[in-house]
Design a protein with these regions (language model features):
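Bacterial N-terminal signal peptides
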Residues: 12-22
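Bacterial N-terminal signal peptides that target proteins for export
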Residues: 2-14
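Short glycine-enriched loop/turn motifs at secondary-structure junctions
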Residues: 50-54, 103-108, 124-125
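C-terminal partner/receptor-binding element of secreted or periplasmic proteins
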Residues: 115-146
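Short acidic/polar alpha-helix capping motifs at helix-coil junctions
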Residues: 13, 28-33, 83-87
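N-terminal secretory signal peptides
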Residues: 26-73
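Mid-chain, structured segments of secreted extracytoplasmic proteins
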Residues: 60-109
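A residue-level structural signature of the nucleotidyltransferase/glycosyltransferase Rossmann-like core
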Residues: 56-57, 111-112, 129
Length: 146
């Protein structure tokens, strides 16, 4: 028998408890529903899409959020984005986006979210790109995905 005494059994039990507790402590990594990136690395670009059925899906940023919007079609209800400068959530459809700046926050070529045109333009002055509305961003991304 491979475990001859109580000490061997106890050691195996302790090791198993440590392994199981470590795995449960580490938890499961939450990933972007579109690209699979670790969401804990992108709190500054958090983007959440809500469906007409009430389901919420978090993406790493606006680009994956726009992708999900296009995939959901009529099941898309709303989205919230995070303003890169203020770090506040806002209604994504009322926001402004800088497309193709020199900064890549989550995905390339990149749409970076801003709650106000002023924040988007302030960012654009330093890092380039094009300031667009949500609808314009959606149309640009629809063309890029063809």
């Amino acid at each position: 028998m491979w475990m001859k005494n109580l000490t061997d059994k106890l050691m195996v039990w302790v090791v198993l408890v440590l392994i199981v507790s470590t795995l449960s402590w580490a938890g499961e990594v939450k990933r972007c529903i579109v690209c699979g990136m670790d969401l804990s690395k992108y709190p500054h670009t958090k983007y959440v899409v809500t469906t007409t059925g009430g389901e919420e899906f978090q993406t790493c940023g606006a680009q994956c959020g726009l992708t999900l919007h296009l995939r959901l079609k009529e099941k898309f209800k709303s989205a919230t984005a995070t303003d890169l400068l203020s770090n506040r959530s806002f209604d994504a459809q009322k926001g402004f986006y800088v497309y193709k700046s020199t900064v890549i926050t989550d995905m390339a070529p990149g749409f970076i979210s801003f709650a106000t045109r002023a924040n988007a333009e302030k960012f654009q002055k330093g890092f380039g790109g094009k300031v667009v509305t949500y609808q314009e961003a959606l149309e640009i991304w629809k063309e890029q995905m063809k």
